A protein has these predicted regions:
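Active-site-flanking segments in enzyme catalytic domains
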Residues: 1-37, 44, 48-186
Length: 186
């Protein structure tokens, strides 16, 4: 969309209504410019795929973004619920924005119903439409979905990530959302 024309993070704040942005101490000027421009392109894809306005990317103005600033071990990117910030790692975050925004949207939905956390993990307090969506990740026609079976398989293969991480409702929500965005863009 922009062909690497932006050199200042202000464009992300203005276009998408983000609350703030942060760069890690070890990001070079070149890293920062690359991150800004890749995030711009990813956000352009995201709002078009979801069918919202660019400003709605910030989920009511509360979402922030960081680049190489808040890394966690081997993660490519992560969403911090308590800070409402998406962190893209310096070297491995490319392609992860839709997934992390899915986590942010999950939290935003919960917030709309007075719940701190993820809507997908607090179904008893959510409307039927959210319950039905999350249930569809795990079960169709009384049988476990391939998506859920595969997620449980990864739970067994990658135990270091935490027991049940891959098959947790909030992780499945974010992965399903990222797939939805990809399908809409194809």
């Amino acid at each position: 969309y922009n062909f690497f024309k932006f050199s200042d993070g202000g464009v992300l704040m203005a276009r998408y209504g983000l609350r703030g942005g942060e760069f890690g101490n070890y990001t070079t000027s070149k890293d920062r410019i690359g991150s800004i421009n890749m995030a711009y392109d990813a956000f352009e894809d995201l709002y078009k795929a979801v069918g919202i306005s660019p400003k709605d990317i910030s989920l009511g103005g509360g979402l922030a973004i960081a680049f190489g600033a808040r890394g966690r071990g081997n993660a490519m990117a992560h969403y911090e619920l308590d800070k409402n910030v998406i962190n893209m790692t310096k070297k491995r975050g490319a392609g992860s924005l839709a997934h992390e925004w899915g986590h942010a949207m999950d939290a935003y939905i919960a917030e709309q119903f007075g719940v701190h956390g993820f809507a997908s993990a607090n179904l008893s307090k959510m409307p039927e439409s959210v319950k039905k969506l999350v249930k569809a990740f795990k079960e169709q026609d009384g049988k476990e979905t391939f998506f859920y079976e595969s997620s449980k398989f990864f739970d067994g293969e990658y135990k270091k990530a935490g027991n049940g991480y891959w098959s947790s409702a909030h992780e499945m929500f974010a992965r399903a959302f990222a797939c939805y965005v990809k399908d809409k863009l194809d």
